[in-house]
Amino acid sequence: MVSKQPRKQRKARYEAPLHMKQKYMAAPLSKALRGKYGRSANVIVGDTVIVMRGDHAGTKGKVEALSLKSGTIVVEGVSVSKVDGTEVPRPIYPSNVMITSLEMNDKHRDSILSRGR
């Protein structure tokens, strides 16, 4: 990014293509994982996370879905109730969660995480 202006920074993030927005989906790792994999990693479906900020702080659950368009993730157990009583998932920004265990079924992800460590 070239400009320092906050409005242009926000615009660049908003208008970025999806392969660039993937880089904004990183979350900090727990202390147990940090020694092996570094400070942060991209969140994928299946990772176990704990919510660190907001009304649902302390809630632990698996990542059920993620949206690159809005830059949010959906964690099981984090929901709000509508007026009619139905529960709807509450999207959370990845920076507000901490990854406690990684989904390692993907060999490509394992090579990415162990690269340069």
Curated annotation (Swiss-Prot):
What would be an example GO MF term here?
structural constituent of ribosome
> What is an annotated GO biological process for this record, any one?
translation
**Can you list the GO cellular component terms from the UniProt entry?**
large ribosomal subunit
In terms of InterPro entries, this protein maps to: KOW (IPR005824), Rib_uL2_dom2 (IPR014722), Ribosomal_uL24_CS (IPR005825), Ribosomal_uL24_euk/arc (IPR005756), Ribosomal_uL24_KOW (IPR041988), Translation_prot_SH3-like_sf (IPR008991)
Which Pfam family is one of this chain's hits?
Answer: Ribosomal_L26
UniProt keywords (A-Z) are: Ribonucleoprotein, Ribosomal protein, RNA-binding, rRNA-binding
Alphabetical list of CDD domains matching this protein: KOW_RPL26
The question of whether Membrane is a record keyword is answered with: no
Q: Which NCBIfam families is this protein grouped with?
A: rplX_A_E (TIGR01080)
Q: What task does this protein carry out?
A: One of two assembly initiator proteins, it binds directly to the 5'-end of the 23S rRNA, where it nucleates assembly of the 50S subunit. Located at the polypeptide exit tunnel on the outside of the subunit.
Describe the family membership recorded for this protein in Swiss-Prot or TrEMBL: Belongs to the universal ribosomal protein uL24 family.
Subunit record text: Part of the 50S ribosomal subunit.
The record's section on HAMAP family has:
Ribosomal_uL24_A
**Record protein name field:** Large ribosomal subunit protein uL24
